[in-house]
């Protein structure tokens, strides 16, 4: 959101010593995050008013004229210009040397300098509207027309920024920081906060209502839970014309574009007090009645942007006695919009509930400045502010206008929240003892009404904060702390008393697994969204019958909640292959499956959700990455102090290669899988010219040991000897069988590689392992080493018919 400080200063007189930098810091620390501070006058640097004194023909160019121009300095300057509407006495826009403009309104900015045009010296440039950001203020009839300021109150030498009000500072506010503050979606709300921060008075807005004796405008609300208030004013003798320059500037600096005076009034009011308005052309309304109702089945509505929508019975619409005119709180219809022949309007100032607007907006993918504000939950009292300001502006801009009818259907006023909070609670939570007067003063500056009795503060929350923002004592505490300033509270550790030791084996196991994969196995952890692109779900061949579909997905293709982490991992791999050929990634996260997980309230209806762990290695050599990942799983239990996992071939995962896969089991129950990803799955995921080994585990089924007995082993006094052995084994023999035998005969054994080549007989494979040998009584001799190796080979040959591979 953009906030104009010139606009804010209409409502509050800020201390003169407060700089823009200090103001943005204070606002960030106490209310909302200011992302940027923009000086709007910078783009008008060296762009001023000039008055044409002479207009002469160019001696060498029929379309150019040589002008003498008064720019407010001692002597006039000569400027060559091709404008079609130049005349003596005309006030024009001059870009002096050093100014930056869009040449003929196109391309990049060009810096003006003194030059010669067809042999004639030219000091600067007489500008058209599109060249100096003025097309909204002075719409040009053709590209050769220059801006005529003769009707504007200005004199030669005046800076254009001062003339149009662009001598302003605009604050860019992070929208996320005011999501729960509907009162701040207007300049008056920001002014109210600054008034409280700097302890200066806020100028009260005058509430003006139409005369009670005028004709009553008939308003019917069918569902008062969706529309707690609807006001309408019928105004005659208004027509389409440009709004005043000051209003156009305010709207521009607020982040919108001026359109015409009628529409600009509605937008100005919305940006001023945060209350959306809408104007209907009164001549196109059938019957003297407005009906707020749910759409009927089969009804359609052509919106302002000529987008035709098929309404549902859940959509709230504004209707005349014949048909829908607008999608309530979101966008008006084309039929009743303001056009060039408009002579009267019906002005809507209403309140709609947040959920109603949010659901309809998502259904039709419509988000407007009005709907954004309604989605934050506006209080009904703000209708009075919006209506009053709008009527004042119509009278100012259209002195001849006439209010001929007014209606206000107000069934559900916003109720003030009442929150009681004890002095003791505030003292403990703040970590600093404030006096009763300090607390009352702080809250009253924010609009609270406060009574203190028997150590209890009874606070009546203002309506603009009573729409879900402030509802409990912690909210009141937060308001006190932020307004005083968090930096003035000394940080103190929370008092914690343990009556017994805390043992959370699952939490510990989760941390160990993350550390094992990241630090020991060199994986990078990734985090993906719970909703998954259906492209990757289909690629992984996952059955979606048990998947949960979102009613209002972030986008059409992201409509399913994940039931496995593998599709998300495929997407991560697809994106990262643009930058890396080989990498390792893992994720631990929740997945969701249809069905009720545990007893809960009817409102919750929680699905089954469980935590899974998945990891992948990406590389060119399929066999190498598979065995690397297999080693990661085999060492998982050892390094993470949990019950042993076993690997076997029982069920092929849907995304797996036909041959290269293993199931991971614990206590004879399959809890996961390890496999190479099939070529078809990779192709459908947009992954080519690489291989992927992937595993997925049910974290909830992993069982950490409850306790362990640590046995201390002295560091070896004598050096260990490493030796690699390449063994010729039957293809059916697994590494686990070899490891179980060798590990009992050596200090340490590890798998190096498996090889199948031309020199390997059919039905055989070569496995290379590394053993570490040692003797506690001294350094091993060559003879001792050879004797130990021969013993290992004899046992392997006897048990598994394994021989040493001959080179």
Provide a role label for each language-model segment:
Residues 1-208, 346, 364-365, 369, ...:
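Phosphate-backbone binding interfaces of nucleic-acid-interacting proteins
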Residues 2, 445-448, 458, 598-601, ...:
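A carboxyl-terminal module marker
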Residues 25, 65, 202-299:
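Glycine/proline-enriched, intrinsically flexible loops and inter-domain linkers
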Residues 42-45, 209-211, 269, 458-460, ...:
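Beta-rich nucleic-acid/ligand-interaction surfaces
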Residues 48-78, 266-335:
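Conserved mixed alpha/beta core segments that line enzyme active sites in large multi-domain catalysts
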Residues 90, 291-331, 335-338, 495-609, ...:
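Class II aminoacyl-tRNA synthetase-like tRNA-binding/catalytic domains
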Residues 118-133, 144-145, 165-167, 318-415, ...:
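Mobile "lid/hinge" segments at catalytic clefts and subdomain interfaces of large enzymes
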Residues 419-423, 427-583, 723, 770-774, ...:
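Extended, well-folded interaction surfaces typified by the phenylalanyl-tRNA synthetase beta subunit core
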């Amino acid at each position: 959101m953009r906030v104009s400080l010139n606009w804010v200063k209409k409502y509050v007189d800020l201390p003169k010593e407060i700089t823009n930098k200090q103001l943005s810091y204070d606002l960030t620390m106490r209310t909302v995050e200011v992302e940027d501070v923009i000086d709007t006058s910078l783009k008008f640097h060296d762009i001023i008013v000039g008055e044409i004194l002479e207009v002469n023909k160019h001696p060498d160019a029929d379309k150019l004229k040589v002008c003498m121009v008064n720019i407010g300095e001692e002597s006039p300057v000569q400027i060559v210009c091709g404008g079609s509407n130049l005349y003596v006495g005309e006030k024009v826009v001059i870009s002096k040397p050093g100014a930056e403009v869009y040449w003929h309104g196109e391309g990049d900015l060009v810096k003006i300098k003194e030059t010669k045009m067809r042999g004639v010296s030219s000091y600067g440039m007489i500008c058209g509207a599109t060249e100096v950001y003025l097309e909204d203020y002075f719409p040009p009839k053709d590209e050769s027309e220059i801006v005529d300021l003769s009707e504007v109150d200005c004199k030669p030498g005046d800076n254009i920024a001062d003339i149009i009000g662009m001598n302003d500072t605009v604050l860019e506010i992070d929208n996320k920081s005011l999501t729960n503050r509907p009162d701040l979606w207007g300049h008056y709300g920001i002014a109210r906060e600054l008034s409280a921060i700097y302890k200066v008075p806020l100028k009260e807005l005058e509430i003006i209502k139409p005369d009670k004796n005028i004709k009553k405008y008939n308003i019917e609300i069918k569902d008062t839970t969706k529309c707690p208030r609807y006001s309408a004013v019928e105004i005659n003798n208004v027509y389409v014309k440009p709004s005043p320059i000051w209003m156009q500037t305010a709207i521009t600096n607020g982040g919108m574009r001026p359109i015409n005076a009628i529409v600009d009034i509605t937008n100005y009011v919305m940006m001023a007090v945060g209350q959306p308005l809408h104007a209907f052309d009164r001549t196109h309304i059938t019957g003297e009645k407005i009906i707020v109702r749910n759409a009927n089945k089969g009804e359609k509505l052509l919106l302002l942007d000529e987008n035709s929508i098929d309404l549902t019975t859940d959509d709230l619409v504004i209707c005349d006695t014949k048909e829908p005119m607008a999608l309530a709180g979101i966008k008006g219809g084309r039929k009743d919009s303001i056009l060039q022949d408009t002579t009267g309007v019906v002005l809507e100032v209403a309140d709609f509930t947040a959920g109603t607007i949010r659901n309809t907006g998502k259904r039709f993918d419509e988000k407007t400045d009005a709907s954004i504000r309604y989605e934050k939950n506006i209080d009904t009292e703000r209708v009075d502010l919006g209506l009053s300001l709008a009527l004042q502006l119509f009278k100012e801009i259209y002195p001849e206008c006439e209010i001929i009818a007014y209606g206000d259907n107000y069934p559900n006023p916003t109720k003030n929240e009442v929150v009681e909070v004890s002095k003791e609670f505030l003292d403990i939570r703040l970590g600093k003892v404030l006096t009763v007067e300090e607390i009352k003063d702080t809250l009253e500056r924010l609009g609270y009404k406060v009574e203190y009795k028997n150590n209890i503060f009874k606070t009546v929350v203002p309506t603009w904060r009573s729409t879900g923002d402030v509802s409990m004592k912690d909210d009141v505490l937060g308001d006190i702390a932020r307004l005083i300033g968090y930096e003035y509270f000394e940080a103190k550790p929370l008092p914690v008393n343990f009556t017994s030791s805390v043992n959370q084996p699952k939490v510990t196991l989760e941390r160990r697994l993350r550390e094992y994969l990241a630090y020991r196995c060199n994986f990078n952890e990734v985090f993906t969204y719970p909703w998954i692109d259906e492209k990757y779900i289909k690629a992984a061949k996952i059955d979606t019958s048990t998947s949960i579909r979102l009613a209002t997905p972030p986008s059409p293709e992201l409509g399913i909640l994940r039931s496995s982490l593998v599709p998300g991992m495929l997407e991560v791999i697809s994106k990262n292959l643009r930058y890396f050929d080989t990498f390792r990634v893992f994720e631990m996260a929740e997945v969701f499956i249809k069905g009720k997980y545990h007893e809960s309230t009817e409102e919750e209806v929680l699905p089954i959700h469980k935590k899974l762990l998945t990891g992948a290695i990406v590389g060119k050599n399929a066999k190498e990455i598979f065995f690397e990942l297999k080693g990661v799983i085999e060492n998982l239990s050892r390094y993470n102090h949990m019950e042993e996992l076993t690997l076997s071939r029982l069920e092929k995962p849907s995304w797996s290669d036909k041959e290269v896969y293993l199931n991971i089991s614990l206590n004879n129950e399959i809890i996961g899988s390890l496999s190479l990803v099939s070529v078809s799955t990779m192709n459908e995921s947009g992954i080519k010219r690489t291989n992927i080994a992937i595993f997925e585990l049910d974290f909830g089924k992993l069982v950490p040991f409850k306790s362990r007995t640590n046995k201390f082993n002295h560091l070896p006094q004598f050096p260990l000897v490493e030796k690699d052995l390449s063994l010729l084994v039957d293809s059916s023999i697994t590494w686990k069988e070899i490891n179980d035998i060798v590990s009992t005969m050596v200090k340490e054994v590890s798998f190096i590689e498996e090889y199948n080549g031309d020199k390997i007989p059919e039905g055989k494979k070569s496995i290379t392992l590394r053993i570490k040998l040692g003797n506690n009584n001294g350094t091993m001799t060559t003879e001792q080493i050879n004797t130990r190796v021969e013993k290992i080979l004899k046992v392997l040959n006897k048990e598994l018919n394994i021989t040493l591979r001959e080179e």
